[in-house]
């Protein structure tokens, strides 16, 4: 009798746990993912600014973005980092989100290129944004939003893009959007910054 009860308990736990995993996957599948680009070398800053805290409790800039994204309905976060500071990143950033939201790492490496491409001799500088996003191709299968980890956005931005991503028909491909800012609101009085100008044509493209 005791053995039977023991096996029944094991079966119950097995099916319950797998049921919960299935439900979580279904729920998270309906939510967009936030992809944070955090592999920068910080050459001008002089260090890993993505790990430096600036909030009252040591919050980083990306912590504020992640909080706002979660409030806007995002269901997973993925970080693109460099392998050489993985341990430091896990300890300072990733650990705080365990049990709160699914979080994963992927790594940007200079020689991780599509077939047919190679690193030019003498190249040491990391590739740009497109290459960083490509590093997450095997992890992200759902609609996602890309941000830089050292830029400050605001909750409204995540609400707007989160709504767009959540309303995409299942199986949609090549559907894109961008949340823009008025240029004047992005300039600093403490130095020069580079900004891109975006415009729309008569067809709203």
Question: Which residues make up each language-model segment?
Answer:
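Ala/Thr-enriched low-complexity intrinsically disordered regions
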Residues: 4-5
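Conserved N-terminal catalytic core of the sugar/cofactor nucleotidyltransferase
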Residues: 13, 19, 23-36, 42, ...
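Active-site glycine-centered loops adjacent to acidic/histidine catalytic or metal-binding residues
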Residues: 40, 150, 182
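Short N-terminal binding/cap micro-motifs at the start of the first secondary-structure element
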Residues: 42-46, 187-188
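Conserved beta-strand scaffold positions in the cores of enzyme catalytic domains, especially
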Residues: 51, 105, 176-178
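Conserved core of the sugar-phosphate nucleotidyltransferase
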Residues: 155-205
